[in-house]
């Protein structure tokens, strides 16, 4: 690649990169609804597919409005992700997650999650703060 009369190859592009990120962007399991599928059924299916954790092993927190993340994509289309708060019934390790879609899967505290989310993603950070506040306020374990 030639840019500003300077030649770049893959090595020089990597060496001269000034990105602050060592890993791909961190996020929540999500996906598109199938035909006639409700938001909640889609969320449970995607969670199970991407994490390998059986949906019977989580409990959606009732009486809690789902969290929504709305943004404009690089294609200038508006997108909305809907997230449901849930808790694990039995703790499990991640052993069979969908490696074709997920490069890394791990448990994080809310503070670790906030650090893992990039600074420009303010809505996602706020979702983490809101969930932590609700779980603390109502002593959800």
Annotate each PLM feature.
Residues 1-26, 31-129, 133-134, 139-140:
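Unchanged
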């Amino acid at each position: 690649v030639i840019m500003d009369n300077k030649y770049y190859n893959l090595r020089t592009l990597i060496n001269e990169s000034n990105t602050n990120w060592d890993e791909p962007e961190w996020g929540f399991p999500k996906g598109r609804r199938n035909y006639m599928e409700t938001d909640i059924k889609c969320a449970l299916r995607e969670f199970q597919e991407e994490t390998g954790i059986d949906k019977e092993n989580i409990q959606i927190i009732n009486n809690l409005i789902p969290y929504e993340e709305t943004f404009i994509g690089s294609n200038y289309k508006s997108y909305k992700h809907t997230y449901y708060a849930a808790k694990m019934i039995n703790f499990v390790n991640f052993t069979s997650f969908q490696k074709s879609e997920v490069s890394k899967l791990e448990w994080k505290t809310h503070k670790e999650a906030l650090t893992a989310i990039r600074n420009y993603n303010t809505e996602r950070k706020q979702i983490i703060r809101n969930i932590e506040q609700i779980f603390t306020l109502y002593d959800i374990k």
